[in-house]
């Protein structure tokens, strides 16, 4: 049990997808203007990562890994296309659910909801799972933790950006300029976790 708690804390803080690996920056910067919208996208990313990482773990270990289907057959060259296909299917299902049951959130996320399909944080989580050879339970914990870490980062950035609307930012830094500086400072803060051994 300690191993799973350690993996969860590590994936949320120490190896944060957004602030340690800088994955998923497109949606991270574009949707982080309001806390409510960024929280909704964060929940969507948590759901997709929590499902996509373990499902792709099963696909990899039962189908794509060397000697998984047939002795001597290695289908690992199909990793990228298969993982992206699974992620795309999951995002489409999530999009239909949000459209049906949460129309305001669906409209607020707009084009960024289908872009979760190509969000490199999702694909990065799946790739790290394969690279680190996680079992199914570890992949569930890692997917959930990575999603929560990404959501924590985007909600924190949105909160800071909402407060910055009322501050006196120099004209040359308004917009993305001050946002990049803010993200850099947040990343420095998360770097302080890098020395933690779990």
From Swiss-Prot:
Q: Main localisation, per the record?
A: membrane
Tell me, which GO biological process terms does this entry list? respiratory electron transport chain; sodium ion transport
Q: How does it sit in the membrane?
A: Multi-pass membrane protein
Which InterPro entries does this UniProt record tie to the protein? NqrDE/RnfAE (IPR003667), NqrDE/RnfAE_oxidrdctase (IPR050133), NqrE (IPR010967)
| Annotated Gene Ontology cellular component terms | Gram-negative-bacterium-type cell wall; plasma membrane
Q: Where are the transmembrane segments?
A: 11-31, 39-59, 77-97, 110-130, 140-160, 176-196
Task: Tell me which EC number(s) this protein carries.
Answer: 7.2.1.1
Cellular compartment(s):
Cell inner membrane
Q: What class of enzyme is it?
A: translocase
Catalytic activity, as annotated: a ubiquinone + n Na(+)(in) + NADH + H(+) = a ubiquinol + n Na(+)(out) + NAD(+)
Instruction: Give the Gene Ontology MF terms in alphabetical order.
Output: oxidoreductase activity, acting on NAD(P)H, quinone or similar compound as acceptor
Read off the Pfam families from this record: Rnf-Nqr
Q: How does it assemble?
A: Composed of six subunits; NqrA, NqrB, NqrC, NqrD, NqrE and NqrF.
Q: By its UniProt entry, which NCBIfam families does this protein fall under?
A: nqrE (TIGR01940)
Its function, per the record, reads:
NQR complex catalyzes the reduction of ubiquinone-1 to ubiquinol by two successive reactions, coupled with the transport of Na(+) ions from the cytoplasm to the periplasm. NqrA to NqrE are probably involved in the second step, the conversion of ubisemiquinone to ubiquinol.
Instruction: Give the UniProt family note.
Output: Belongs to the NqrDE/RnfAE family.
Q: Could you tell me what this protein is called?
A: Na(+)-translocating NADH-quinone reductase subunit E
> What organism is recorded for this protein?
Vibrio parahaemolyticus serotype O3:K6 (strain RIMD 2210633)
